Amino acid sequence: MEIGSLVTARSTDFNLTAAKAPSDGVIIGQGLIDGNLVFIYSQDATVLNGTIGEMHAKKIASVYDMAMKMGAPVIGFIDCGGIRLQESVDALDGFGLIYAKEVAASGVIPQICGVFGNCGGGLSVVPALCDFAYIEESKGRMFVNTPDAIEGNRVEKCDTAAASFQSENNGCVDGIGSEDDIIADIRALVSMLPLNNEGDVYTDSCEDDLNRACNSMADMKADPRFLLSELSDDHVFFETKKDFAKNMVTGFVKLNGMTVGAVANCSTVYDAEGKKAEEFALSLTAKGCNKAAEFVSFCDAFSIPVLTLTNVNGFKNCMCSEKKLAKALARMTYAFSSATCPKVNLITGEAYGSAYVAMNSKSIGADMVYAYHDAKIGMMDSKIAAEIMYPGADAKEIDEKAADYEKLQSSVSSAAARGYVDLIIDPADTRKYLVGAFEMLYTKYVDAPEKKHGTK
């Protein structure tokens, strides 16, 4: 149902004689998605090229005001020619008004954006401030600077405004596709999320067997997308930011109808035919840490429980990564540790060093930690540790010392004996244990220290 269809631009020195523009280039309204109330704004590029002026911005702001009152998500569709030059500072003030409304709504109601045309300059901040953003693969273009304005760049060499470039590099795009694909994803996302920060995470009923055996889990550790699909209700896994930092997988699963956010280390990406498409080291990267941190912060804001699948043995060691990794690692550690939502960690493979600690370990606040029988938890690989501790030993002695070290220091049983693992489980039983853990943690309450906010 459309709202504000009679709104038009005010007269200015440069458009006194201009014809009236229907809806001032943006259509706003409210509707239902699977029975859930949502508020929508959609820019109309056929009217004033979809440019943002004073009244255009006020219409979008009014959508946010209504959504905040009703506790309902906001969905925006962008196709914009930029700022309306005729309205000068009034139009700039409109940009600021939209930014402010998005910031005020952050962590209160979900914000979702679809870019179906141009989204350039200051307007690119709008999808970046949203919780989830999508770009239409052929017509959608998102940029701060146009590709031909970037020093040293050529359009034919690198189209930095293209959907594929933005999806792989900027960290705020959750997916690209056709308009129909994007709308379908948005509808699915709305159905999975709480409507607001006080909404219930039980967003669906469950007819899937809660004790269903996941017999192929042990073979899926390399690509957690398959593992998460296997353990979820009806095998549904909704991935976010799928093209960005592929070595860190984020998305949503369902466990007994409860929406759970998932963060997982990934070493292999398989294609639709089950063949290896990409491979990564079991190491944390700056992009991956930032991706995980942002996702965990969103989940915590809406009290969505978080599940981590840990399989990591260190950090990416290259010059580019070293420039950013410490800050990104701190951000991810802060996000996990400060989150008060239910947190469960499942160690599926290796868990070595401070990379393991940062991945939602017991040490930084995980409520429950499970591990598979063949998981390895410790300072580092046992053979490397033996070589460091016994530098003059021959190969046979190194192997013997490594075996002793692994048994005493790096085995899952030794970690469990010290309380760092709550239970060692069989991969086939993963689903039933996770369902039970999150059911138990549903009423979790944390009396956090009083403060304005943290600094990371």
Where are these regions (language model features)?
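Ligand-binding clefts of soluble mixed alpha/beta catalytic domains
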Residues: 1-456
